[in-house]
Amino acid sequence: RSVSRGLGDVYKRQLSEVATLAVVTNGFQKVQIRRLAESGVLNFMEDVFVSEKMDSEKPNRRIFDAALRALGVENREHVLVVGDGLSSDIQGGVNAGLDTCWYNPSHAENPGKVVPTYEIADLKELYPLVMEQEELANVGLKNRRHQC
């Protein structure tokens, strides 16, 4: 998806050093893993949760709940769902009671049915969303307080 293509390897690596990154996606396991590998994003992910194996799909909250359990997430306030699909990614995050960030590089108009917590046009804008102000000066250090 465009989310994985929107960020260079250096930024993916830096982001993975300050946040636990995981993918929640709909589709078939083999196809999605191949796509993630081809995009270069797979190397930076803690885990990948594909609807075929999860017995649920976005926007159902169950797939997000299962992913958070598998990742050992205890505090949902430190979770940010980032996605480019309002009806699946963002609605799924909303359904799961999570903060959401709509990746909207084309500045498309939001029809307003699904309201994300944040909206960004460049994935570099994620840094201030997942890091405390004092952490921004230390990009590159292992600090996994936040999870995307």
Could you say what each language-model-derived stretch is?
Residues 14-18:
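A short, Lys/Arg-enriched amphipathic alpha-helix followed by its capping loop at the start of a domain
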Residues 12-13, 90:
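Short amphipathic alpha-helical segments and helix-helix/interface helices
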